[in-house]
Amino acid sequence: MTQDVRRSKLEFNKLQKRLRRNVGKAIADYNMIEDGDKVMVCLSGGKDSYAMLDILMGLQKAAPIKFDIVAVNMDQKQPGFPEHILPEYLDSLGIEYHIVERDTYSVVKSVIPEGKTTCGLCSRLRRGTLYGFAERIGATKIALGHHRDDIVETLFLNMFYGGRLKAMPPKLLADDKRNIIIRPLAYCVEADLEEFAKQKAFPIIPCNLCGSQENLQRQAIKQMLQGWEKQFPGRIETIFSSLQRVSASQLADTELYDFVGLTIDRSAEPKDYGEQSAINVFPPLDDSFAGNSLKGEQDPVKLIEAVNLG
């Protein structure tokens, strides 16, 4: 084995361990998979869902709990879709899988004008079909392949174009409460997944339902974030971390926090806000200062000088 091959193998092992560690941590943090679960892994044929299936299968062998994996792909009847690729790949893995056939292509093409983005309607139709199929096969969790970068991009998409502070949660109870959606790749970086897919040589199937048309808004957000990351390394991770530490009282949503019902309560001991240093710098106000009286007002120039000297 040459030195280059040895180094390449070492780098791949590090990458695989990092991805498995990130997926394992996300699963543990959000209790995504429990003992006895039947996890329906949605496989699109893209790099992310392939990686998700591969990593979950690896974790399944080492996990202290027992859970089943069922791979599901939705054949949307796009012209030229290579129907043989996924069945051949999944047969080689020896796992249970289903190909769900639904002609959403015709529906999307009949509703969306030529040249317009089809992603929104396509995803809604696909989601409805997959939710129903999950119930049919008794799946207790639906695993989707969205990663950390997808989540942050969605946050800014909703802010910039929808006026909502909303992203993609790592774990979600569907509106009708009949399905739980999990995103095991929530802590994974897209660049890692791209390299992993390249090294594993997954048989990638491009989405050509809309002629490989890019979602221009998402691409603009992606470029913006990449620019930030280049200038300020670690920026995307910091933004993602902020989604895990939300202070509802510091925002402005009256449904999320009861601003209207705020009242004063001075029965408890005053909280130390760390202003002892300010108390030491500023001399106490004269006793004559009360109400609208200005007799005890301090000279602002002297106060500023005192602060500067301190």
Swiss-Prot record:
One of its GO terms (molecular function) is tRNA binding. Keywords: 4Fe-4S, ATP-binding, Cytoplasm, Iron, Iron-sulfur, Magnesium, Metal-binding, Nucleotide-binding, RNA-binding, Transferase, tRNA processing, tRNA-binding. The keyword Cytoplasm applies. Binds 1 [4Fe-4S] cluster per subunit. The cluster is chelated by three Cys residues, the fourth Fe has a free coordination site that may bind a sulfur atom transferred from the persulfide of IscS. The keyword Nucleotide-binding applies. It catalyses: cytidine(32) in tRNA + S-sulfanyl-L-cysteinyl-[cysteine desulfurase] + AH2 + ATP = 2-thiocytidine(32) in tRNA + L-cysteinyl-[cysteine desulfurase] + A + AMP + diphosphate + H(+). It is found in: Cytoplasm. [4Fe-4S] cluster binds at C119, C122, C210. Its cofactor is Mg(2+); [4Fe-4S] cluster. GO terms for cellular component: cytoplasm. A motif (PP-loop motif) lies at residues 44-49. It is an enzyme of class 2 (transferase). Its EC number is 2.8.1.-. InterPro entries: Rossmann-like_a/b/a_fold (IPR014729), TilS/TtcA_N (IPR011063), tRNA_Cyd_32_2_STrfase (IPR012089), tRNA_thiolation_TtcA_Ctu1 (IPR035107). Pathway: tRNA modification. GO terms for biological process: tRNA thio-modification. The thiolation reaction likely consists of two steps: a first activation step by ATP to form an adenylated intermediate of the target base of tRNA, and a second nucleophilic substitution step of the sulfur (S) atom supplied by the hydrosulfide attached to the Fe-S cluster. Catalyzes the ATP-dependent 2-thiolation of cytidine in position 32 of tRNA, to form 2-thiocytidine (s(2)C32). The sulfur atoms are provided by the cysteine/cysteine desulfurase (IscS) system. HAMAP family: TtcA. Homodimer. This is tRNA-cytidine(32) 2-sulfurtransferase. It comes from Saccharophagus degradans (strain 2-40 / ATCC 43961 / DSM 17024). The lineage of its organism: Bacteria, Pseudomonadati, Pseudomonadota, Gammaproteobacteria, Cellvibrionales.
